Amino acid sequence: MASFRTLFACVVILCCVLWSSMARYGEDMEVETEMNKRDEGVRCTGQHASSFCLNGGTCRHIASLGEYYCICPGDYTGHRCDQKSG
């Protein structure tokens, strides 16, 4: 019986952690999930290549969608690498 209680407690804790992460990063997670479903695009050119991403991020362009996004260095996050992690 103790192992069932331990398992139940672990499941509850895991659900709480996931729920709080989704509440905090839900919108970003949706965007990342959508991006992961698509190809990674190509490296940006022109003005976007040097100015779209902040804090050392790498700009990517998905031509078929007309969208730009950034691959951020480890200590930044956000659509344009504009938010400091942690």
UniProtKB/Swiss-Prot annotation:
Disulfide-linked positions: 44-59, 53-70, 72-81
Gene Ontology CC terms, in alphabetical order: extracellular region; nematocyst
Matching Gene3D superfamilies: Laminin
Membrane spanning residue stretches: none
Annotated CDD domains: EGF_CA
Signal peptide interval: 1-23
GO molecular function: toxin activity
Pfam families given in the database record: EGF
Propeptide feature: residues: 24-36
Main location per the UniProt record: secreted
Domain of life from the UniProt record: Eukaryota
Localization per Swiss-Prot or TrEMBL: Secreted; Nematocyst
Keywords: Cleavage on pair of basic residues, Disulfide bond, EGF-like domain, Nematocyst, Secreted, Signal, Toxin
Matches recorded under InterPro entries: EGF-like_dom
EGF-like domain sequence ranges: 40-82
Similarity comment: family membership: Belongs to the EGF domain peptide family.
Known role: Has both toxic and EGF activity. Its EGF activity consists of rounding cells (morphological change) and inducing tyrosine phosphorylation of the EGFR in A431 cells, but with a lower potency that human EGF.
Protein name, as recorded: OMEGA-stichotoxin-Shd4a
